[in-house]
């Protein structure tokens, strides 16, 4: 299936914005101001070709979470292509078959048996979010915490709630509740109905890694606002989409991703999906 690139929006850190616009110093005189604007446009245009591959500050996404909620499950991008945009991330696979987790450049498909299978490059994804992970902030977690408490702790250490963050937590867990969803057949059910057949796994006294993202509230409909985490065991053998956890201690790392690039399906069910609805209740049902 052909893929068409859409640059949805570009978010730059304040220091970058200041640098780009430093040429616009005042309103007196048209020549300097016009020159500054032209150089700004050129700077942004020159940046676009550089952000599609191998950029640690780019969060790259395939399709939207609302499209997935509405049952747009046909894969549109091979994992071999997805790997050129990141070595860390989460998502799902063609037909909603299992949970995707990428860590240290290795991609895994966690199926309904809870096993994490290494992924071949030919399998496709209908929805995924990836980046090249480079930690900007690190924290030591010494106290036990449930999922909500862990998220609150991370929130307290965010430079801003308005940026995108890749989140990695290595730790010891007394309990992890995770899930995976079986492959769906057409006509596809919406995701809130498809998860009724999910498999739930419970891990006890296990070491492993949480992989995921924290996205701002203003991307509702595009991605999952707040935290979206998947889990994989330390030996990379099992895991799933995180529903609940009890963490004993660990190390957290945040990667600030100040640029957001999204690729949308160029045909298929996405074209006719009734996007723009308020699907918050469905999202909460699916995520919890």
Swiss-Prot record:
The keyword Repeat does not apply. Coiled coil: none annotated. GO terms for biological process: acetoin biosynthetic process. The keyword Lyase applies. It catalyses: (2S)-2-acetolactate + H(+) = (R)-acetoin + CO2. Its EC number is 4.1.1.5. Belongs to the alpha-acetolactate decarboxylase family. This is Alpha-acetolactate decarboxylase.
